[in-house]
Amino acid sequence: MSSESMKNKHRNSKRTPSPLQKERRRNWESHKSRSRSPIRRHGEKNLEYAHHSNQENRQSSYTALKTSDQATKTKEKTSGGNRTNPYTVFSQHRANHSDAPGWCGFYWHSTRLARDGTNCIFNEMKQEFQELQINGKITWDNARELLFSQKKKLDQKYRNMLYHFRHSPDCPRCDYWDNVYRRHLAHVSSQESEEVTDEEMLSAVESMDTNASN
C-alpha cells in the first residue's frame, strides 16, 4: 500500500468517529447539559421565591387592612353613640335639674366602683408596672403586689358601699338617683341598655370630670 493510501485511510479514520468516541461524546454532551440544569433550577427557584414573596406580601397587606378595618369598627362600636350609662344619665339629669341632690344609690355606686377598677388598670397599675418592669417583664412577686394593692383599694370601697346600704336603708339620695335611672331604663331598648365597656366607662367619666371642672 502506498504512502498516499495510508494517509487517506488515516485521514478518513479521523473524520469518522469510532463507537467509543461516539459514546464519549454523548457522555460529554450529557454532562454539559446537566451542568447547565442547576442554573435553570436556580432561576426557577428565584421565580418561585418571588411568587411566594408576592403572595406573602399580599397576604400581609390583606391582614393589615382587615385588622385596621376591625379596629375602626370596634372604635365606632364603643364610641358611645346613643348608648348610655349611669354617669351620662345622671350628668344630663343634673344639667337639667340644678336642685338635684348629691349622687348616690345602687346604680351610682356600682358604676363608680367599676370606674375605679378600670382607672386603676389603665392608669395606676400601668404606671406601677412600667416602674417595675425589666425588658417588658415583671416577676410574680411584683405582679402579686400589684394585684393585692388593687384588691385592698377595691375592698375598702366595697365595704364603704355595703356599710352605707346597711346603715342608711332609707337614704333619700339613693331613692332619688335609683328612680332617675329606672325611669331611663324604662325608655330605652334592650339593645341600647347593653353592658357598658371599660373604654366607654372611662370616656364617660373623663367627660364628666371635664364638665365638672368647667
Curated annotation (Swiss-Prot):
Subcellular location: Host nucleus
Pfam family of the protein (one): NP1-WLL
Keyword Transcription regulation included in the entry's annotation: yes
Chain segments carrying region Disordered: 1-87, 192-214
Keywords of the record: Activator, Host nucleus, Transcription, Transcription regulation
Biased composition (Polar residues): 56-71
Comp. bias regions, Basic and acidic residues: 44-55
GO biological-process terms attached to the record: positive regulation of RNA splicing; transcription antitermination
Family as reported in the entry's similarity comment: Belongs to the Bocaparvovirus Non-structural protein NP-1 family.
Described function: Required for the expression of the capsid proteins. Performs the splicing and internal polyadenylation of the viral capsid-encoding mRNA precursor, which allows its maturation and expression. Transactivates the viral promoter.
Protein's UniProt name: Non-structural protein NP-1
